[in-house]
């Protein structure tokens, strides 16, 4: 319990410390690759009818003639101040506005997918461990492998084809506080598509952790002393075995987003 929470908090802390370095590294790599493109941004923005003077004016206005490091430094400075640039050639649509618009729905979808993953994978993993090498374990392991190998985008397309006309697959998302039923129905299919691969992985992680804990000496000693196995599992094994799955689950939050 408390140990699992502490491990998760330490993991989150390490990730937060590493996040700025990762952002700078990834942004530098992407910026460098984009700079190697033979396509002239000014030509793409202004089109074929643009005069050489107009193209040059566009390059000067947007700093495209500056050295690469100067351009990247300007981009990084703007990014640190919340300006991520624009999207769409020749438009003034800000990426920051796009992210701000999509982030609330992304967080809601992540939460629901995470909830599905926890409610399904943890009981399945525990059940598989308790029936190790018997048919429930074998069936659960087969389905977990299938889940791990199922691409979310492919499953999402299948769900849309299978449930079109039965569940809403398009249209605006109502606010949860206004229409919780409508919100859940519109979130259901994408949340399932996101959760299935995580369910497959987490089921295996929970099973492995439970099996390792069930094989420990204190479990055999307690059962040998006459304590019912279900009591040992409920009071000790579950608490100790869930430390690793909770940590791994924290890592999967980024995948769900």
Tell where the protein language model's regions lie, with residue ranges:
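Membrane-water interface segments at the C-terminal ends of transmembrane alpha-helices
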Residues: 29-36, 66, 74-77, 142-171, ...
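Hydrophobic alpha-helical transmembrane segments of membrane transport/permease proteins
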Residues: 22-73, 163-186
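N-terminal signal-anchor/signal peptide hydrophobic helix marking the start
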Residues: 13-23
């Amino acid at each position: 319990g408390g140990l699992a929470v502490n491990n998760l908090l330490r993991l989150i802390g390490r990730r937060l410390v590493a996040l700025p370095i990762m952002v700078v590294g990834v942004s530098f790599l992407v910026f460098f690759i984009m700079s190697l493109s033979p396509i002239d941004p000014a030509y793409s923005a202004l089109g074929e009818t643009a005069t050489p003077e107009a193209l040059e004016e566009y390059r000067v206005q947007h700093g495209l003639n500056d050295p690469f490091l100067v351009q990247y430094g300007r981009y990084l400075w703007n990014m640190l101040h919340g300006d991520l640039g624009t999207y769409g050639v020749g438009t003034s649509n800000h990426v920051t506005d796009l992210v701000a618009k999509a982030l609330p729905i992304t967080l809601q979808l992540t939460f629901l997918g995470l909830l599905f993953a926890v409610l399904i994978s943890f009981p399945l993993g525990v059940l598989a461990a308790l029936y190790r090498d018997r048919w429930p374990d074998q069936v659960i392991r087969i389905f977990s492998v299938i889940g791990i190998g199922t691409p979310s985008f492919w499953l999402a397309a299948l769900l849309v084809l299978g449930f079109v006309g039965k569940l809403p697959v398009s249209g605006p998302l109502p606010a949860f506080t206004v229409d919780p039923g409508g919100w859940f129905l519109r979130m259901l299919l994408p949340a399932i598509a996101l959760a299935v691969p995580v369910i497959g992985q987490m089921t295996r992680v929970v099973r492995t952790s439970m099996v390792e804990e069930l094989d420990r000496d204190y479990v055999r000693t307690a059962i040998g002393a006459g304590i019912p196995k279900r009591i040992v599992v409920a009071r000790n094994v579950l608490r100790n075995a869930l430390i690793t799955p909770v940590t791994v689950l924290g890592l999967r939050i980024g995948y769900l987003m």
